[in-house]
Amino acid sequence: MGTTSPNSEKRQITDINERRKLQNRVAQRKYRTRQKTRMKLAEAVLNDYTYIHPTLGTIQSKKKSPLTMECDRSSASYPDLSSYAEICSETRSETQATRARQLTSQRTCFRESVDNNQADSHAQLSRCLNRQEMFYGISGETEFSEGDTRDRVECIDPNLTRGWLDMDLRSGTPNSSTVVDCGLCTVGANSQPPTRTNVQEAIETLELFEPNDQRKTENLPREPCGSCPSSSHGYSPTSGNPSTLLLTPSESLMNSVIVTSDSPLLAADDKSPGDLVISEANTHGPKEDQFSPLMTAISLGRLDIARILLQSGAPLDIPDDSGKTALHRAVGRRELHMVEALLNLGAEMLATDHEGNSLLHIAVKTNSLSITRLLLERYKSCRELKDAQLGHGCRQHGNQVHSESWIDLRNREGMTAVHLSVIFNRPEILQLLVKYSANVN
């Protein structure tokens, strides 16, 4: 078998490439030719012209184009090309003259219609001014009027009783059923001023809640009777002093402003039916504000500032009406950082409320395992170190117990923390109490 030399292989590859290039050029030339033929055929079909196909011959059109008809007529009657040019110019001038006449006619018709419309609009405007009416819309069919000043609707703001254009409008008297809803009472064209009963019923529907569904804490000043607007101009409860309904947010449930049916909304000596007073309900709140500077510093974690306030005489263990101190409230809210901060500042650990519940009772009820562990660890460390402050605090609050029995302290119902953990199904807390030597008998 013969072998092929490298030169012959290179020559063969070159010949193949040249042949492929030639085939590509031929294919591209054929493609361009076909595209041109298709474009000419499509143009002839769209313009309905006669087209001479190179292979199919002449393709006759169904109708002649205007240019073809003009050329045929000119070739039959005017074989001279100069005459044909003159005919085309005359035809063009006639067409332009016809278009000019049509445009002039359209402008004339439009001017006449505009004049008629202006005349109608002027007449309509004069009729409106004569009758002192106000129209709305393109055709003027919809009619609006303020009505007679004697039957005008009573508004909340007396300034709104003036006319829109300070005119004495007589047409379109509003119906007596026209009402204006001002939030608390509804007044109409023939309505009476709001009575004391209606206003009180409307106020009773108002509910002032915080974002976390807690009542507001605020002492609202009473508005004098003379500050309320007259009943002839309507009534607005906030027109005298709108700031009376602005309450600052609070997270406590101690002081609340509650509007109820038996709240003294209207005093007996009130002379105006619009004089409303939001009074404080008799709620059981702490004697000291929960958000005092000391409690604010503790909530922010600034124990250094809290110590300065304590050294300056700020109270820490003042109980509220139910006997709960700030430490009791922190345990009830399950705020571990607040409980730890209060204990570090020396808050009374053995204090109980009026029901005899200790911090441990409250922690078991709220199912706070972390606070229970913290209290038990602090109790154990205080017992081991024989903390004098712990015993002093126990004697100070009248608890006739020793520090060793604090974990087994009973409330007024005779329940210990172990009892509560069993009643409330707290197995983890029960194991923790047993670990710290709580009495299970």
UniProtKB/Swiss-Prot annotation:
Residue spans of the ANK repeats: 289-318, 322-351, 355-384, 413-440
InterPro entries reported in the protein's UniProt record: Ankyrin_rpt, Ankyrin_rpt-contain_sf, bZIP, bZIP_sf
Entries under SUPFAM superfamilies matching the protein: Ankyrin repeat (SSF48403), Leucine zipper domain (SSF57959)
Metal-binding among keywords: no
Record GO biological process: positive regulation of DNA-templated transcription; regulation of DNA-templated transcription; toxin biosynthetic process
Protein keywords: Activator, ANK repeat, DNA-binding, Nucleus, Repeat, Transcription, Transcription regulation
Alphabetized GO MF terms: DNA binding; DNA-binding transcription factor activity
Disruption phenotype: Does not affect growth and sporulation but abolishes HC-toxin production and pathogenicity.
Matches recorded under SMART domains: ANK
Region described as Basic DNA-binding region: spans on this chain: 14-40
Main location: nucleus
A Pfam cross-reference name: Ank
Note: The genes involved in HC-toxin biosynthesis, called collectively TOX2, are organized into a diffuse cluster that spans >500 kb. All of the known genes are duplicated or triplicated within this region, with some variation in copy number and chromosomal location among different race 1 strains.
Domain notes: Contains a basic DNA-binding region at the N-terminus which is usually found in bZIP transcription factors, but does not contain the characteristic leucine zipper domain. Instead, four C-terminal ankyrin repeats were identified that were shown to confer protein-protein interaction of regulatory proteins.
Family: Belongs to the bZIP family.
Record's function text: Transcription factor, part of the diffuse TOX2 gene cluster that mediates the biosynthesis of the HC-toxin, cyclic tetrapeptide of structure cyclo(D-Pro-L-Ala-D-Ala-L-Aeo), where Aeo stands for 2-amino-9,10-epoxi-8-oxodecanoic acid. HC-toxin is a determinant of specificity and virulence in the interaction between the producing fungus and its host, maize. TOXE is a pathway-specific transcription factor which coordinates the expression of genes involved in HC-toxin biosynthesis.
Subunit architecture: Monomer.
Protein name per Swiss-Prot or TrEMBL: Transcription factor TOXE
Species whose genome carries this gene: Cochliobolus carbonum (Maize leaf spot fungus)
Gene: TOXE
